[in-house]
UniProtKB/Swiss-Prot annotation:
Residues 207-209 are annotated as: G5. This is Probable translation initiation factor IF-2. Residues 139-142 are annotated as: G4. Residues 45-49 are annotated as: G2. GO terms for molecular function: GTP binding; GTPase activity; translation initiation factor activity. Pfam families: GTP_EFTU, GTP_EFTU_D2, GTP_EFTU_D4, IF-2. Disulfide bonds: none annotated. Belongs to the TRAFAC class translation factor GTPase superfamily. Classic translation factor GTPase family. IF-2 subfamily. Residues 85-88 are annotated as: G3. Gene3D superfamilies: P-loop containing nucleotide triphosphate hydrolases, Translation factors, Translation initiation factor IF- 2, domain 3.
C-alpha cells in the first residue's frame, strides 16, 4: 500500500465511476480496464482496493504509448486512476458529498446500437445534479455488422482498417448519440474532433469485449483530469475525509464499512465519526484492511491484509466497534483531536438531516437502503413534481404506513410508499393491506418512479370515469304521440331521444324549466337499458309529481335537468368529453335555466 508521500501535499488519483443503462456493458468495460491494469502493471504494484481498482500511472503510460503519434503532448502526471468497482448509479448515489459527489469524473456507457435508454437519461440527470463531468463510451462497436475487430488497439488505429461503409454506419450511430446528448442539454462530438473539452462532451467509440478504443478512453480521462482538475486532486497529510460505500458483515470481523477516502490520511487507532441510523457514530479504527494480492491468497489467511495507514484516494475496509447502525452514503471523518469530536458530530448530523425528510405536508413516503439512494429517489420524485412527506433509510415500518394513510385521506395519489431496495416489515405489510396503502418496491430507481407514475395515471383515469359517471349529461327527448302507457305514479311513456343521452336516475324538466320527476327505468321492448342515445326510441318510467295530460302531453319536448355544479364541470374540466349533439343540447338547457338563475352556466375567469 502506498505510504504518505514526501512533503505535505500530493496529487491523488481521480475517482472514476461508470454509469449507464442495464446490459449496455458497464461491468464488461470495468473488467476490461481491470484486466489491462493487472496485465500491464509493474511487479509489486497493487491494483485492487476495497470496492475500487487502481490503474497505476505505469499502466497508463504503456496504454497511451501507441497514441503518442496522435497526441504528442500527452504526459502522465497523476499517480493513476481509481475506478469504483460497482457500476451503476445506485452505488454512485452513495458517493455523495455536500453539494456534489466524491466522484471526480464519470464514464457514461451507451450501447451504440441501442442509443439512449431510460437509465442513460437518468444517469445524465444524476451527473448533472451532482455536477460530475463525464465522457461517453459508445460501446459495442464490434456489434456493427461487418466490423473487423482488432483486439486492444486504439480506436484511431482500428477505424483505419474498416470498410468505408462500416465507417459511415459508425458515423450515423455517433450522430444519433450527439443528437440525444443535445436533447439532454449537452454539446457533444467524437473525442478526436472536440475543440474545447470544457464545453463539449467527448464520445469515445469502444468495444469492452475486444478492448478497441480503451486506450483512448483511459488517455482521455487522464488528460481531462490533469488539465481541468489538478486543484481538486491536491490532497495532504490532513485527517482523512471519505464516504461510506457499503456496510458489510465480515466473518470474524463483525460489521465493517467499505469506504472511499478522497482526502487526507487515515491511520489505525484514529477516532472517526460516521453517520448512523439514529445518530452519528464515534468510534476508533481497529483495523484498516486491503485485499490480499491474489498471488498471496492462502485459504487460511483470509481475504484481507491489515495496513497501518492509507492515503487518498483509496478504497479501504474499516473494522471498528459500534458500526452496526452505520449508513451507506454517509460521510466519514477522521477527528484531528478529542476536543473536535462535537464539531464533527454536528457536521455529520447536518449532512444526514439534509437528506432525510419529515414534514406535515401531503406527499409520498420514501424508504431506501442507503443515504445515497434515498437522496437519488427523492431527487427523481422532485423532477416529476411529486411531493414527499417523509424520506428515511431503513425497512418499511407500520409508522410509514400510518404517515402514508394521512396523505391518502387528503390526496389518494400521494397515499403510497416508495420503497427502494428495502424490506417491508410483516406488521407494516398487514397494516398496509388493511389501510389499502399501496407500496411500490423496486431496485431500479427509474422503474420505481415509472411504476408509480403509471399507477397515478390509472388512478386519475378511474377517478375521472367515476366523476363522469356521477355527472348528469345533457339529454333532449320528445314524447311520442300514441305512446302514453300510464299517466302517473309512475308515468310510462314512449319517447324519442333527439339529442344527447338519458339514463335511469336523471331528473327531467320541461321547456320552461319546471322539474317533472326522475327517470326510473328505460326499456326497449323486453330489454332494460342502462342508457338511450340520440336516434333511439324507448319507453321510460318517470317517478315524481307528474300527470300526463296536465303537466306534459304527447309531442312535448323534455330535457335532463342538470345541476349548476355539473354544468360548470361540463363547461370546464370535461368540455372535451361531450359529443357535438350533447354540446348543442347543453346550450339549450343553459338558455332555459338562465331565466331562473342568471349565473347558471357562467364560467368565471374564462
Amino acid at each position: 500500500m502506498s505510504s504518505v508521500k514526501s512533503g505535505k501535499s500530493w496529487i491523488r488519483q481521480p475517482i472514476v465511476v461508470v454509469l449507464g443503462h442495464v446490459d449496455h456493458g458497464k461491468t464488461t468495460l470495468l473488467d476490461k480496464i481491470r484486466g489491462t491494469a493487472v496485465a500491464k502493471k509493474e511487479p509489486g504494484e497493487i491494483t485492487q482496493h476495497v470496492g475500487a481498482s487502481i490503474v497505476p500511472a505505469s499502466v497508463l503510460r504503456k496504454v497511451a504509448e501507441p497514441l503518442k503519434k496522435y497526441f504528442p503532448k500527452l504526459k502522465i502526471e497523476i499517480p493513476g486512476l481509481l475506478f469504483v468497482d460497482t457500476p451503476g448509479h445506485e452505488l454512485f448515489s452513495n458517493l455523495r458529498r455536500r453539494g456534489g459527489s466524491v466522484a471526480d469524473i464519470a464514464i457514461l456507457v451507451v450501447d451504440i446500437m441501442e442509443g439512449f435508454q431510460p437509465q442513460t437519461w437518468e444517469s445524465i440527470q444524476i451527473l448533472k445534479e451532482r455536477k460530475v463531468p463525464f465522457i461517453v463510451a459508445a460501446n459495442k462497436i464490434d456489434r456493427i455488422p461487418g466490423w473487423k475487430p482488432n483486439h486492444d488497439q486504439p480506436f484511431l488505429e482500428t477505424i483505419r482498417k474498416q470498410d468505408p461503409r462500416i465507417v459511415s454506419r459508425l458515423e450515423e450511430l455517433i450522430y444519433r448519440l450527439i443528437s440525444q446528448l443535445y436533447e439532454a442539454g449537452f454539446m457533444a462530438e467524437r473525442f478526436d474532433r472536440v475543440k474545447d473539452f470544457r464545453t463539449t462532451v467527448a464520445i469515445v467509440p469502444v468495444s469492452a469485449k475486444t478492448g478497441e478504443g480503451v486506450p483512448e478512453l483511459l488517455a482521455l480521462l487522464t488528460g481531462l483530469v490533469q488539465r481541468f482538475m489538478k486543484k481538486r486532486l491536491v490532497t495532504s497529510e490532513e485527517p482523512a475525509k471519505g464516504v461510506v460505500l457499503e456496510v458489510k458483515e465480515e466473518p470474524g470481523l463483525g460489521t465493517t464499512i467499505d469506504v472511499i477516502i478522497y482526502d487526507g490520511v487515515i491511520r489505525r487507532g484514529d477516532t472517526i465519526v460516521v453517520g448512523g441510523k439514529d445518530k452519528p457514530i464515534v468510534t476508533k479504527v481497529r483495523a484498516l484492511l486491503m485485499p490480499r494480492p491474489l498471488q498471496d491468497m492462502r485459504a487460511h489467511e483470509g481475504k484481507f491484509v491489515s495496513v497501518e495507514q492509507v492515503v487518498a484516494a483509496t478504497g479501504v475496509k474499516i473494522s471498528a466497534p459500534d458500526l452496526d447502525n452505520a449508513l451507506a452514503g454517509s460521510p466519514i471523518f477522521v477527528v484531528p483531536s478529542e476536543d473536535k469530536i462535537e464539531e464533527y458530530i454536528k457536521i455529520v448530523k447536518e449532512e444526514i438531516e439534509s437528506v432525510r425528510i419529515k414534514t406535515d405536508n401531503i406527499g409520498v413516503v420514501v424508504k431506501a437502503d442507503t443515504l445515497g439512494t434515498l437522496e437519488a429517489v427523492v431527487e427523481a420524485l422532485k423532477r416529476e413534481n411529486i411531493p414527499v412527506r417523509l424520506a428515511d433509510v431503513g425497512p418499511v415500518s407500520k409508522n410509514d404506513v400510518l404517515e402514508a394513510s394521512v396523505s391518502k385521506n387528503h390526496r389518494p395519489e400521494y397515499g403510497v410508499i416508495i420503497a427502494f431496495n428495502v424490506k417491508i416489515l410483516p406488521e407494516a405489510e398487514e397494516y398496509a393491506a388493511r389501510e389499502n396503502v399501496k407500496i411500490f418496491r423496486h431496485n431500479v430507481i427509474y422503474k420505481l418512479i415509472e411504476d408509480y407514475i403509471g399507477w397515478v395515471k390509472q388512478l386519475r383515469e378511474q377517478e375521472k370515469i367515476k366523476e363522469l359517471e356521477s355527472l348528469i349529461r345533457p339529454g333532449k327527448i320528445r314524447i311520442l304521440p300514441g305512446y302514453i302507457f300510464r299517466r302517473s305514479n309512475p308515468a310510462i311513456v314512449g319517447v324519442e331521444v333527439i339529442g344527447g343521452v338519458i339514463k335511469p336516475g336523471y331528473p327531467l324538466m320541461r321547456k320552461d324549466g319546471m322539474r317533472l320527476g326522475t327517470i326510473m327505468q328505460i326499456r326497449d321492448r323486453d330489454n332494460v337499458l342502462k342508457e338511450a342515445r340520440a336516434g333511439q326510441s324507448v319507453a321510460i318510467s318517470i317517478r315524481g309529481r307528474i300527470l300526463v295530460g296536465r303537466h306534459v302531453d304527447e309531442g312535448d319536448i323534455l330535457y335532463t335537468d342538470i345541476p349548476k355544479q355539473h354544468v360548470h364541470l361540463w363547461l370546464t374540466k370535461y368540455k372535451n368529453e361531450l359529443s357535438d349533439d350533447e354540446k348543442m343540447v347543453l346550450k339549450e338547457i343553459i338558455e332555459i335555466k338562465k331565466k331562473q338563475d342568471p349565473f347558471y352556466g357562467l364560467v368565471f375567469g374564462s
